[in-house]
């Protein structure tokens, strides 16, 4: 099978400790993609496309299961994308940016408030192709992040050229 592995920037608005970003990152890495994670240190839901102006942005390494997972920053989702592009990974030319997997729906007018969508929009402004992914299970069922992560991995398999 001919597949093009991609350099993928991952962020979210639920924070680096959220199950959605961790599940997606693990799946993409298992498949062989180069995945670079920069996410808020805490839940930043509802931050839209906001940026941090009144305090210095700081980032530090985040470990998961005893291994380097990515960087967490004390800013908003759009800050994560900016900092990844212009500082942390300034020498990397990303093929794609994925924001998510978000916990909860982002439908209709929700997009105006969504930090998940805001991070993807920032990537687009920085000339990085982007996707934002949200998951809402009806009737209070448990979120199935594995299903969505598998779907995204297969979706990326199906496209050889994301230009």
Task: Report each predicted region and the residues it spans.
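A cross-family phosphate/adenosyl-ligand binding-site feature
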Residues: 2-11, 18, 22-87, 91-93
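Glycine/threonine-rich flexible loop motifs
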Residues: 105-114
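Short beta-strand segments
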Residues: 11, 38-40, 99-102, 133-134
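Glycine-rich, Lys/Arg-enriched anion-binding loops that position phosphate/diphosphate groups
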Residues: 116, 125-163
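Short, Asp-centered acidic motifs that coordinate Mg2+ and/or phosphate
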Residues: 96
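Alpha-helix C-terminal capping segments
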Residues: 84-91, 120-129
